[in-house]
A protein has these predicted regions:
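Short phosphate-coordinating micro-motif centered on Lys-Gly-acidic
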Residues: 2-4, 95-151
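N-terminal pre-Walker A segment at the start of P-loop NTPase domains
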Residues: 1-20
Length: 151
């Protein structure tokens, strides 16, 4: 799997990467966000929401599991799978993952891995300092990597 990597020095720079992703990814894209607690997953989603002109406050939907933002340039489906496991993944999430007219961002994707499409884009976030992060974006689809190369 090929990848592109970035280093950000602040939450603002992490949100800017998300903003640019919103403009680079085609409809139906599924983005799996991988990283420890506090790694910047939700911060990146906030940037994506900003890039889609979504004005609502974006918070991790940990207890709701999913939040759908419809008031923007295109829909954003934000899933936090942390509280899920194989026994309780059959709650209809598959209807929203890869929503054809929008973007799907999934925090803690390893808990619903069997629901992820083959062409899922993986974004791995690693803290390297207080607000510094390494961001690695990978995909098996070379067209996706080409689209986000200039992010």
């Amino acid at each position: 799997m090929e990848y592109i990597s970035y280093h950000t020095s602040s939450d603002l720079e992490t949100r800017q990467i998300g903003y640019k992703l919103a403009h680079s990814l085609p409809n139906g894209s599924v983005v799996a966000l991988v990283g420890d607690l506090g790694a910047g997953k939700t911060t990146l989603v906030r940037g994506v929401a900003s890039g889609l002109n979504i004005k609502e406050v974006v918070q991790s939907p940990t207890f709701n599991i999913m939040k759908i933002y419809l008031k923007g340039d295109r829909p954003l489906i934000h899933i936090d799978a942390y509280r899920l496991n194989d026994a309780n993944t059959d709650i209809g999430l598959d209807e929203y993952i890869g929503y054809e007219n929008g973007l799907t961002m999934i925090e803690w994707p390893m808990f619903i891995e069997k629901l992820l499409p083959k062409d899922t884009i993986y974004v791995e976030l690693t803290n390297t300092g207080e607000e510094e992060r390494n961001i690695k974006i990978s995909s098996d689809n070379p067209k996706i990597l080409e689209a986000i190369k200039n992010v």
